[in-house]
Regions:
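Membrane-helix interface segments
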Residues: 37-40, 67-71, 144-149
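Aromatic-anchored segments of alpha-helical transmembrane domains
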Residues: 17-23, 79-87, 154-167
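Membrane-embedded catalytic cores of phosphoryl/pyrophosphoryl-handling enzymes
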Residues: 106-207
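Hydrophobic alpha-helical transmembrane segments
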Residues: 48-67, 127-132
Length: 207
């Protein structure tokens, strides 16, 4: 079966690129901020944690008991992704500011209660890179399962979009992050998956 997950991700990159070309990034952020509501605020502020390293660690542990091979490929993909993203954030793009830095002084800016806003190290989005790395590895392992691929790609996109909703990243940041995470995970899967067929089994603690 065709790797539908990757095709959908490519299409979202295309749509994102068009948006970046034709929309002013600050005006776009202002509109997103204004269309929000308290219900979305609750969902977004919790869903965004799926891009945290802690969430990735929990997924990796769970994967060990499903398929060791998948867990190891995900671990390598996540580690490489996190390293590259942090290198880019703190070297080449260390002066890049987050949307909140520019919008916090707007008179009609809609603040989310009890949410911690950050202002620096905007590019690329670490949360987006992390969730796409993890989801891409899992989706690759289930290439024959269309439903699993669709669930994973929708989940990854939603988690990345929370960063825009929360004014923590511009659209370009989450696209770059998703690009890094997806490509690293995809090529790691292609290279490592056939080499670790002997690990295509769950971890059993009683063995």
């Amino acid at each position: 079966m065709q790797f539908i997950y990757l095709n959908i991700v490519r299409f979202t990159w295309f749509l994102g690129a068009l948006s970046i070309l034709f929309l002013d990034k600050l005006d776009f952020q202002r509109k997103i901020n204004q269309i929000g509501n308290s219900g979305f605020d609750v969902v977004m502020r919790y869903l965004t944690h799926a891009g945290d390293g802690i969430f990735a660690l929990l997924v990796l542990i769970a994967l060990l008991f499903i398929r060791i091979k998948t867990a190891l490929i995900a671990l390598i993909s996540f580690g490489l992704t996190a390293g590259i993203v942090q290198l880019l954030k703190h070297t080449f793009f260390k002066t890049m500011k987050r949307p909140y830095y520019f919008l916090q002084s707007d008179a009609d800016f809609r603040f989310i209660e009890d949410f911690t806003y950050h202002t620096s190290n905007s590019f690329p989005s670490g949360h987006s890179a992390s969730i796409f790395a993890i989801c891409t590895v899992i989706a690759y392992q289930y290439k024959s399962k269309l439903s699993i691929q669709l669930i994973l790609v929708i989940f990854a996109i939603l988690v990345a979009l929370t960063r825009v909703y929360l004014c923590q990243h511009f659209l370009q940041d989450i696209i770059a992050g998703s690009l890094i995470g997806t490509l690293i995970a995809y090529y790691a899967s292609i290279f490592l998956e056939p080499k670790w067929n002997h690990l295509d089994k769950p971890l059993r603690l009683n063995e």
